[in-house]
Amino acid sequence: MEFTHLDENGMVRMADVSGKPPTRRKACASGRIVMLPETIALLRRKELPKGNVLAAAKIAGIQAAKQTSTLIPLCHQLNLSWIDIEFEIGDDSIGIAATVITRESTGVEMEALAAVSVAALTIYDMCKAVDKTMEISAIRLDHKTGGKSSAAEYHPRTAILVMSDSIAAGTATDHSGAILREGLQKAGCAVEALTITPDEPVEIAATVEAWIGEGIEFIVTSGGTGLGPRDLAIDTLAPKFTRRLPGVEQELLRWGQTKTRTAMLSRLAAGVIGNTVVVCLPGSTSAAKDALEVLVPAIFHAFPMLKGDGHA
């Protein structure tokens, strides 16, 4: 198991999320503080000596969510879009629920948990003069959405085609195909083939057509998307698309452009041939890594849709 918060020497470090595209993320956490019924009665009547307990607790919880990266050393500084805290007053306890939303490259679970924790501590502080029996309990993450954990669980049968005269001739080594295979396998895909062909249209087309005939659902190609005379992937495969996937193309180009200025020269393409999704990538290792960040797991939603199972 790979731990992102440990370096090769076992020392703690922040996880590097710079390679992850920002997405909408939401986390909800909850907790409870138990107290005497008499304390609840004072709170309801707003007769506690320190004033409006729940108003102060809500503000404190919101501030705690904003300050999570300061309180917890390895948390990232995030631009939080929305924070809300709600209270449920019972006979002998107060339930606390926090919701935090952001559009960032990592989640806001810790921010939601921090909000609940500090809201509970604030209630404790403001009531402790009249109640020595209070107990904070059951602080937990209820659910989160966004990022990879909320993606569709479908994992397509996959094949990877590397197009390169030099790699096919044995004068160069394939790295991009290996990166794609490792990344897609980690994402749960069954990578059934990794094939290397020269930049020959007939061989490229024959390989892809054979895979489609075998029921391969997801084909990722590497190489042949540039402006050179032997960059023939797009010229060979794009005319076979029954439908283009412009959103996939745009996101791959946009993400690549944030890393490499020359990404705008790529002719990468994405489309559907029958019921097979085909994504044609540049041949660089950086393009392969970027594609994994962009495609996984969002692209997996396409396959149930192609089968007529809707947009769930």
Swiss-Prot record:
Its EC number is 4.6.1.17. One of its GO terms (biological process) is Mo-molybdopterin cofactor biosynthetic process. CDD domains: MoaC_PE, MogA_MoaB. It is an enzyme of class 4 (lyase). Residues 156-312 are annotated as: Molybdenum cofactor biosynthesis protein B. One of its GO terms (molecular function) is cyclic pyranopterin monophosphate synthase activity. Pfam families: MoaC, MoCF_biosynth. Residues 1-155 are annotated as: Molybdenum cofactor biosynthesis protein C. The keyword 4Fe-4S does not apply. Pathway: Cofactor biosynthesis; molybdopterin biosynthesis. Keywords: Lyase, Molybdenum cofactor biosynthesis. Substrate binds at L74, C75, H76, M110, E111. InterPro entries: MoaB/Mog-like_dom_sf, MoaB/Mog_dom, MoaC, MoaC_bact/euk, MoaC_MogA, MoaC_sf, Mopterin_CF_biosynth-C_dom, MPT_Adenylyltrnsfr/MoaC-Rel. The keyword Disulfide bond does not apply. It catalyses: (8S)-3',8-cyclo-7,8-dihydroguanosine 5'-triphosphate = cyclic pyranopterin phosphate + diphosphate. The active site is at D125. In the N-terminal section; belongs to the MoaC family. Catalyzes the conversion of (8S)-3',8-cyclo-7,8-dihydroguanosine 5'-triphosphate to cyclic pyranopterin monophosphate (cPMP). NCBIfam families: moaC, molyb_syn, PRK03604.1, PRK09364.1. This is Molybdenum cofactor biosynthesis bifunctional protein. It comes from Chlorobaculum tepidum (strain ATCC 49652 / DSM 12025 / NBRC 103806 / TLS) (Chlorobium tepidum). The gene is moaCB.
